[in-house]
């Protein structure tokens, strides 16, 4: 059983995830992303090619489920795999904790151990008893404790609110948490790796880190948040030298080809005019605009007030994330600070980088941007569990009490967060979208800006389930983007056939705006209103 501890932890979380899985699309981007995966389209910036390709392949498996539910199931799979990798990484970290300790801390620990040893008086009878006791008993006890500690930390992460919520429906962050866990695993293995970073060997974990990093960036740009922590561990191990910088080159040789290969999906697929073709990234200008998320940069580092608001939200929501296990986290922060300063600094860097970056993004659904911070917190919880389980030395009864407290805290966390994340009865967005479409006449033109509740779900129901494909749904805000007209032209050419002259004038006036050049806002607004008016007359 011990051999499969990480797999079993992931499997247990998957079973619980099934109970909270959404049966259909839910709010925000769920409908659009489900449609993109099912139809092999182009998603909103930054495109998410890895997410799209893996989702499309999974959607082809004949499971006998509706596509929305099947793709939601994939989200649960990603989160479960993330839990399994996290749990295994936690065990590796505990087994190699001395390798992460600085020489100063190791010397201090050795002095304390020697001092305590000198104070203990051992009788002849005790010596005989000790000599007969198997030497492996203590090691086996520690090994078992490490397994249980790693599993406990894995469950704390798996059932934290935001992490758990990613398992309920289609979103890019379910795959991202899996990739974050793989990145941290490869970093831990790389730090304890005895070979050179430039080794061109299959087992070199630094090359695996580069591979997972490329996968991460091809899924979501928040992958960059792992880089400061990675740099800390790398240069801590190899120091700043000419050789250490040259050793990065083989990693780049792995990173860039994989990244480029995956992102080539966007222009290749866009040139085939998929039904969902956000940004139409067929040329270099549109491609760069899309993968950099230029249209969303207006909300990034927008103001100090916004950052202060998001920071306040992060800390006030922490208890809602972890509930009573937050006390284990606090104990873990103190424990690892003294036990292994290097692990503490690595986790602190990941935590602070994530929080300080994410609070500067002024959006409502900010929680998922804190996921790497929540993973870091769960590693702190690992050492909190380790500290509590160390009470074994104080007697079996005290140890059992500490274990029961840990288990009780995790059960409370699962119980409280279950109702917060449960989407198993969520049909609201399907019912609302279908009811609205049913209420319209054939070939109706519907103007809307309700992305979260109607437009995004309609992408799925119209393009995957073929429900009321005759209706022309226009996102009035996306009419301000040049690529959107190409998408309408492909799906409903008759809808804009009579206003092509106005569209041509608008696109000419829009070009300098999209390029960040000087533009005439009055002309743009006038043409935009003319297009909307002519669409419904």
Feature annotation, model-predicted:
Residues 2-27, 157-160, 220, 253-273, ...:
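Transmembrane signal-anchor helices characteristic of membrane glycosylation enzymes that use polyprenol
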Residues 7, 73-137, 182-189, 379-383:
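Transmembrane-helix motifs of polytopic, lipid-linked glycan transferases
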Residues 18-20, 64-68, 72, 79, ...:
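Aromatic- and kink-enriched transmembrane "portal" helix at the membrane-lumen/periplasm boundary
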Residues 21-33, 43-55, 275-280, 424-429, ...:
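Extracytoplasmic catalytic/substrate-binding loops of multi-pass membrane glycan-assembly enzymes
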Residues 36-39, 153-158, 205-219:
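Membrane-interface alpha helices of multi-pass inner-membrane proteins
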Residues 37-69, 76-77:
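Short hydrophobic/aromatic helix or loop-helix immediately within or flanking a transmembrane segment
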Residues 55-62, 71-86, 91-94, 98, ...:
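Transmembrane alpha-helices of multi-pass, membrane-embedded glycan-processing enzymes
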Residues 97, 169-177, 182-194, 205-208, ...:
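ER/secretory pathway lumenal C-terminal domains and tails of membrane proteins involved
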């Amino acid at each position: 059983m011990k051999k499969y501890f990480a797999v079993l932890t992931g499997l247990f979380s998957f079973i619980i995830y099934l109970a909270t899985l959404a049966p259909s699309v839910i709010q925000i981007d769920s409908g659009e992303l489900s449609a993109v995966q099912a139809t092999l389209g182009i998603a909103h910036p930054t495109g998410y090619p890895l997410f799209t390709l893996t989702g499309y392949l999974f959607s082809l498996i004949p499971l006998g489920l509706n596509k929305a539910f099947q793709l939601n199931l994939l989200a649960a799979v990603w989160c479960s795999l993330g839990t399994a990798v996290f749990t295994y990484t936690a065990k590796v970290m505990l087994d190699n904790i001395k390798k992460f300790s600085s020489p100063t801390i190791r010397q201090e620990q050795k002095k304390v151990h020697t001092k305590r040893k000198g104070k203990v008086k051992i009788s002849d009878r005790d010596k005989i008893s000790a000599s007969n006791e198997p030497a492996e008993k203590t090691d086996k006890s520690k090994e078992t404790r490490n397994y249980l500690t790693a599993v406990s930390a894995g469950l704390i992460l798996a059932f934290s609110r935001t992490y758990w919520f990613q398992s309920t429906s289609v979103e890019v962050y379910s795959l991202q948490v899996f990739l974050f866990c793989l990145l941290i695993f490869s970093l831990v293995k790389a730090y304890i790796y005895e070979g050179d970073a430039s080794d061109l060997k299959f087992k070199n974990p630094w090359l695996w880190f580069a591979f997972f990093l490329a996968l991460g960036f091809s899924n979501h740009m928040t992958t960059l948040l792992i880089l400061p922590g990675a740099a800390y561990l790398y240069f801590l191990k190899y120091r700043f030298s000419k050789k250490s910088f040259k050793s990065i080159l083989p990693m780049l040789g792995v990173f860039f080809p994989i990244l480029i290969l995956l992102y080539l999906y966007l222009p290749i697929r866009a040139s085939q005019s998929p039904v969902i073709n956000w940004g139409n990234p067929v040329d270099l200008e549109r491609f760069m605009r899309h993968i950099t998320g230029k249209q969303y940069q207006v909300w990034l580092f927008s103001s100090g007030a916004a950052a202060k608001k998001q920071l306040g939200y992060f800390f006030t929501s922490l208890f809602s994330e972890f509930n009573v296990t937050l006390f284990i986290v606090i104990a873990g922060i103190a424990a690892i600070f003294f036990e292994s300063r290097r692990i503490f600094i690595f986790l602190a860097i990941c935590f602070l980088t994530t929080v300080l970056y994410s609070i500067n993004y002024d959006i409502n659904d900010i929680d998922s941007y804190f996921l790497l911070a929540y993973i870091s917190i769960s590693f702190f919880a690992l050492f909190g569990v380790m500290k509590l389980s160390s009470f074994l030395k104080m007697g079996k009864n005290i140890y059992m009490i500490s274990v029961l407290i840990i288990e009780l805290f995790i059960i409370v966390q699962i119980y409280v967060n279950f109702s917060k994340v449960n989407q198993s009865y969520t049909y609201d967005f399907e019912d609302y979208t279908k009811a609205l479409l049913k209420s319209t006449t054939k070939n109706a033109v519907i103007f809307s800006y309700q992305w979260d509740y109607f437009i995004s779900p309609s992408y799925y129901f119209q393009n995957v389930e073929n429900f009321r494909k005759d209706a022309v749904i226009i996102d009035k805000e996306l009419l301000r983007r040049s690529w959107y007209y190409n998408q309408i032209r492909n799906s409903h050419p008759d809808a804009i056939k009579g206003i092509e002259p106005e569209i041509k004038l608008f696109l000419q006036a829009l070009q300098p705006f999209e390029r960040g050049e000087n533009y005439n806002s009055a002309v743009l607004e006038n043409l935009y209103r003319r297009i909307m008016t002519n669409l419904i007359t």
